[in-house]
Amino acid sequence: MILSDRDIRAELESGKIKVEPSEGLEDRIGPDGIDMRLGTTFLVFERNKQAYIDPRKPDSAKGTTRQIDIKPDEPFIVHPHELVLASTLERLTISNDLLGRLEGRSSLGRLGIIVHSTASIFHPGWDGTATMELGNLGVMPVALYPGMRICMFTFERMSSPVENPYGSKANKYQGQTGPLPSGVWEELDDELEQGELRKGKQAGLFAKDGDS
């Protein structure tokens, strides 16, 4: 069940939802969510000597992103067909019985700006700023400014508190304070250590019908 503005205010009061900094927060609470603002740090992608990025080889991603920090009154230009990692100005903390969902804003969508490619869910127990996968689907560059409303968070109540909230184990993005690049290599390292993708193991997982 998605929380209403009344429920969101109650959870902010109880501490189950925390948003910092909180100045002007009341004005950004909508009927079913909270508007979040754009931070000042961006990761832009650049071509390098690597032919492609290999999720099994962390070195293949070295030099593919460059960090840009801008002043609060400076614009950041998102060019057509460009992918940029950015983060919310606010740090969000949610309890073990709530799930957060990052949504785009219609006003920016009509300019071609999307705020995530796949990562919209923030699991129970999440704590940190939210990394956004900003993209420009339009034909014109678009200027974005730190502090502007960039996305909205909605919240859903779980059927019960989760047993293993995000952060109870080693989670690569927990506690982030700015945009972070992909951590897919950590996942593959864990899988390889467990033997899930090791050559000759679990061959039946990839077997085709009729293979013996």
Question: What kind of feature is each model-predicted range?
Answer:
Residues M1-S212:
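DUTPase catalytic domain/fold
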